A protein has these predicted regions:
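Catalytic cores of alpha/beta
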Residues: 34, 76, 80-94, 194-222
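C-terminal helical cap(s) of enzyme catalytic domains, especially alpha/beta-barrels
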Residues: 63-69, 226-252
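Glycine/Thr-rich beta-alpha phosphate-binding loop at enzyme active sites
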Residues: 142-188, 228-231, 236
């Protein structure tokens, strides 16, 4: 079973999937092993690895180390064409459809496609939709694109639908790392009503209840990352997973 089909199966069985984003610039040393073990024990469904910036060139060794620790899916969430390695299971082949920067719509893809093929990576076509979040985010700056206004759910829905018609297999609604505000629930709901492919929601989700509300409103995959850079929050990972897995009764 490929990774995309595995994601679909998880969504069907659990109601939604919960992925945690690992940033090689932030998670270092022995904390990698410890954090991944906590995630596995807490019911996390897989990992995204990537970041808009890579300050130390440690991407491939980091992915290799993570794969050596866990049997959960490890998916590249690329911030640049340098973040490609055969040690991962798959890569989100991202097009920033909320913007009009040709480099992030098709330019970088032409360069990276042969590299991905050579690495024998499963590429998952993903529409990346940046949503206004109350602050300027690294993703916005690095992609050179404006986010969709958070009070314009109809624009997000039309954008997502167009991406689906173009053949995208995932829609990623992104508020941005460390966002002040999450993607609005009404926007998630409208996009889910328009689209038939899985919807990922990430950015600024800081509580299990927020994660649950995204799923209730139609999100199929929840991504958190920045929130768990603080080890004091690791105890909440299981609560996040339980909140996302709406088809599984919570054990008391």
């Amino acid at each position: 079973m490929n990774i995309y089909d595995n994601i679909l199966k998880t969504i069907q069985q659990k109601g939604a999937a919960y992925l945690i984003l690992l940033d090689p610039d932030k998670l270092v040393g022995d904390n990698i092993n410890k954090f991944i073990r906590v995630c596995e024990d807490s019911g996390v469904d897989g990992f995204l690895i990537g970041g808009s910036l890579m300050l130390d060139g440690n991407f491939e060794p980091f992915v290799k180390k993570v794969k050596g620790i866990t049997k959960l899916p490890v998916i590249i969430f690329p911030g640049s064409i340098n973040q490609i390695t055969s040690f991962a299971d798959a890569i989100l082949f991202i097009s920033v459809v909320s913007g009009r920067n040709p480099e992030h719509l098709i330019g970088k893809h032409v360069i990276s496609a042969p590299i991905i093929k050579q690495a024998n990576l499963e590429a998952i076509p993903t529409a990346y939709v940046l949503i206004e979040s109350g602050t300027s985010t690294t993703a916005q700056y690095m992609s050179g694109s404006l986010p969709i206004p958070r009070n314009k759910p109809e624009i997000a829905a039309a954008t997502a639908l167009a991406a689906e018609y173009l053949g995208m297999k995932l829609i990623y609604l992104e508020a941005g790392s460390g966002a002040k505000e999450t993607v609005p629930n009404e926007m998630v709901k409208l996009v889910s009503e328009y689209c038939n492919v899985p919807i990922i929601v990430g950015g600024g989700i800081k509580s299990p209840n927020e994660a649950r509300q995204k799923v209730i409103n139609g999100a199929n995959i929840i991504v958190t990352g920045n929130f768990f850079e603080n080890e004091n929050n690791w105890d909440l990972i299981k609560q996040f997973a339980d909140s996302v897995h709406v088809n599984i009764p919570i054990k008391v």
